[in-house]
Curated annotation (Swiss-Prot):
GO terms for cellular component: cytosol. Catalyzes the conversion of AMP and phosphate to adenine and ribose 1,5-bisphosphate (R15P). Exhibits phosphorylase activity toward CMP and UMP in addition to AMP. Functions in an archaeal AMP degradation pathway, together with R15P isomerase and RubisCO. AMP binds at residues 169, 195-200, 204, 265, 289. It comes from Methanoculleus marisnigri (strain ATCC 35101 / DSM 1498 / JR1). It is an enzyme of class 2 (transferase). It comes from the Archaea. PROSITE patterns: THYMID_PHOSPHORYLASE. One of its GO terms (molecular function) is 1,4-alpha-oligoglucan phosphorylase activity. This is AMP phosphorylase.
Amino acid sequence: MKLTVKLLDIENRGVLLHCTDARSMRVRDGDRVQIVDEATGKTAQAHVDTTGSLIEPGVIGVYRPVNATLAVDEGTPVEVRGAERPASLEHIKKKMDGGRFTKDDTVDIVRDIVDDVLSPGEITAYVTASYINGLDMDEVEYLTRATVETGERLHFTRHPIVDKHSIGGVPGNKITLLIAPIIAASGLLIPKTSSRAITGAGGTADLMEVLAPVSFPALEVQQMTEKVGGAIVWGGATNIAPADDKIITYEYPLRIDARGQMIASVMAKKFAVGADLVVIDIPVGRNTKIATAQEGRKLAREFIDLGERLGMRVECALSYGESLVGHTIGPNLEVREALAVLEGATEPNSLIQKSLSLAGIALEMAGKAGPGQGARAAADILRSGKALEKMRQIIEIQGGDPNVKAEDIVPGECRFDVNAPQDGYVIELNNSALVTLARLAGSPYDHGAGLLVHAKKGTRVRKGDPIFTIYADREWRLERAIEVGRTLMPVLVEGMVLERIPHERWV
């Protein structure tokens, strides 16, 4: 059927048909059509929405993402015809029924995700099926390789290339802002592609964006890394492992991070940037993704095994995950805390020690420090000011202000102190509840939003002492966080005597 294009400036991978045209073509909402610009030969496949009033018969509404492929002008005549269901839908249905993906199944699915053949609902079905039924190690390898092969790769002439990753689950984990410049200052290359927050209140890319732009094409990431030793960028802008970033888009609203997909996501990006040596941080503890050390060791073995399949040397570190790293959650607050350490601050100890330990593992793997001497070598680089200077170089080459100081980074203007209800000790910090409050306050999208935790687990407090402060850029977000915070109880305070049990209760 010949239809005339009407461009619709809406972010939707589909087209809009008048219901009479849809009936003539025997297509319904959710079906697919193929659009062909016969003048240029360009084609695109899209799912269908129908309307009886928004457009006229004889017109096809083309949403912005579809026209990124077609590149047609308003009023262009195009040929529109029904399209077959992609085979990848049958593969997804098989996984929903408890089956397993073959290598070819995985290639079909990943290619259709990258080419925008699958609708948002279909990608969500894939994410959910993989989450519920899991992926075995062969399926994880298939997904990793397919994710890399459908995107760009970096090719360095100097080796080894070092990379690190934290699987998340613990708030305030701003360690990359220290580890990357320490490793780069040692003379190694670290092209750190990072993701934005999925279930947390700020991914590394969200934090780095406070200091400098993070969206760069792959070639520029390689050039920046070769010039100054490192970069901290958003992987979603590089076309490195593009399927992964699209999958993350659908994991985010569900707040799920399927284990097999998580392993493939991490390792695909490391493989694509040419990493030889990889350090994986696995936080362990209640209210984290990994509850026990036994489970953490199992996950570590899976990372190491996949690394061997891909030709990378991987080492993992189980880290304490029952309390936030440092005292801050949210982009501006975390960046300010990390910059202060680079500038010479000796607190917070949890941030400094974790960063030095993980950087030290990388230095030992690369032969820059002897066995057991890595953390000390990393500390020497930090204390000497070389890491700060390297971070300034990274900020500058990415287009930020290299002279920025910790004191220049300020939290949101709206704030609320949550005070201790009684004298006692902080006996628990609920990570997931703290993250929920930070997100309600606007983090990570509002850079000034987040939490400053004054009293961590084991701290003695007096009634009325501030336990944590909520910051927000907008008053209504702060009010919402306060309202929900009254029911979440993210921090528990108890006296040394937990409960009095009188004689009368047992008479």
